[in-house]
Amino acid sequence: MERLLDNKFSIEDVHEESLRPKTLEEYIGQQKVKEKIKIFIEAAKKRKEPLDHVLLYGPPGLGKTTLANIIANEMGVDIKITSGPAIERAGDLVAILTNIGENNILFIDEIHRLNRTIEEVLYPAMEDKKVDIVIGKGPSAKTIRLTLPPFTLIGATTRAGLLSSPLRDRFGIIERLDYYTVEELSQIVMRSASILKCDIEKEACIEIAKRSRGTPRVANRLLRRLRDYAMVKHTGSITYEVAKSGLEMFEVDEYGLDLVDRNILEAIVYKFGGGPVGLSTIAAAISEDEGTIEDIYEPYLIQEGFLVKTARGRVATQKAISHIAKIKFKLKESGDNR
């Protein structure tokens, strides 16, 4: 079953398109990044040049794709969207590059997953606006260098450390997107509820924001699920009490942790004495993929002070130990033996 708090893109998030802001003014949060991007855009427009190449990095669900679309909109240019895994051959990338219009934007999501051979096609394209095409095979093969129109590459990644230095160094603008505050998320929830024509109390927006793991994508997903819950179980309006009872039914606690997060913490606390314990051991203990734990669950647990990464492994903090003990006590009181 799909995880409600998963900050990765899902099929259902296609419906989120209507919730996406279209301008920097509408874009809530990431204030420092916004201010810098606004300056770079205005300067590029005054010079009548394309924006310098941009690398956006940070955890999933924080608005990298949205920001790329906003940049295109603010620059008044078209954007071509693709992803690292979708570009399987160097020829695929060459075809995309040779079809980009002047000053337009190419957005590559998960750019860290580009094959190194394919990545090398980008070097002359980004630096010199040139791309090499090989015609023919064997000894008679010839290389023709084509000139590309000026363009902007926007790359997005959740793992900036996996980018090769030659690629990373070719980006003139590198910005990290951070987790959102509760206040910012509550504004996003209120705005989304208005677009969805969903009646919601301010206190309910704050409650959703508190449990959204600092991530707009999660906040919007919780809002849609609570809209369903309110329509079926209540009058349709999302009050504070409706939000609280709905989130409890979805097993999303006051810290924004779900069953999977708690399984990780419980394994470290009860099976391995609080740690330190290796990632592979945790993964085996809860039957979860190592990469999924490291990329999806751990960043938030570390950010919120539940987990510490050391050279010897993962260690549960006192906050984690207290929280897990409190949950166990509540379950015991309610007769739940989990």
Swiss-Prot record:
One of its GO terms (molecular function) is four-way junction helicase activity. Mg(2+) binds at T65. One of its GO terms (cellular component) is Holliday junction resolvase complex. Residues 254-338 are annotated as: Head domain (RuvB-H). Has 3 domains, the large (RuvB-L) and small ATPase (RuvB-S) domains and the C-terminal head (RuvB-H) domain. The head domain binds DNA, while the ATPase domains jointly bind ATP, ADP or are empty depending on the state of the subunit in the translocation cycle. During a single DNA translocation step the structure of each domain remains the same, but their relative positions change. Belongs to the RuvB family. This is Holliday junction branch migration complex subunit RuvB.
